[in-house]
Amino acid sequence: PTTVNYLEEKAVLKLETRTVQLSSKNKLQTLVDLIEHLGNQPGIVFCNLRDSIDSVSRFLDKKNIKHSCFSGGMEQKDRERALIKFRNRTSQILIATDLASRGIDVPELKFIIHYEMSRTLEEYTHRNGRVGRVKSKGTAYVLKEENRDLPEFVKNSRAVNISKKSVRKAQFWETLFISGGRKDKISKGDIAGLFFKQGNITKDQLGIIELKQDCAFVAVPKSIADQLVNKLNNTRLKKKKVRVTVLQS
């Protein structure tokens, strides 16, 4: 008989790399054109500097593209909340430094964008490792500036035409903050029960619940978020009176 050891099988990185020629001198506009070409898929935009993250964030705000920022210059609490909003799809895009290229818990992604090129092959490889894992395919996009050469490890990437835009849907999810957590003996089931019974929502309207030691975060449709805050704020969850608010950026 033939013995197959499945533990020896290794996940194959199913990754394609593509270059995007800047359509104008405005690199930020090319980035937005690419995001609009890709539609409503979640992805990470990698930058080298905190200043770059800030400028990309301001531009995406103007274009009404929901996003979160993630860098070493932020407080741990703010980084954690950025990831929560990205995981539950309140944010479509995560704008990040290389801190997000390893060791963070995010769902399987279809794409990443190198807004600024990695300084080393190792950083480039770690960034690309966020996509194309396990069974799904992913694409890493590199923004190619005119008269600026790409590193050797990127030069074989095929150029892609991004002139065609996908239909972008409006933001669906919003994140609610609850001021009670595990230390208050609150469970995910307790939170779901509160939203079903007192919030009068359906199962389809309850998104991802993330439970922490002293608080919790719940994704709900943006269209009913304020309504749920009015219904549930200052109610009792287990024995604790909790605040329920919309999580601000």
Predicted regions and their residues:
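Conserved helicase ATPase core of P-loop NTP-dependent helicases/translocases
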Residues: 53-59, 65-97
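Non-catalytic terminal extensions of ATP-dependent helicases
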Residues: 161-249
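Conserved segment of the helicase C-terminal RecA-like domain
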Residues: 119-161
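Short glycine-/polar-rich loops that comprise or flank the Walker A/P-loop
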Residues: 1-2, 13-17, 39-41, 63-66, ...
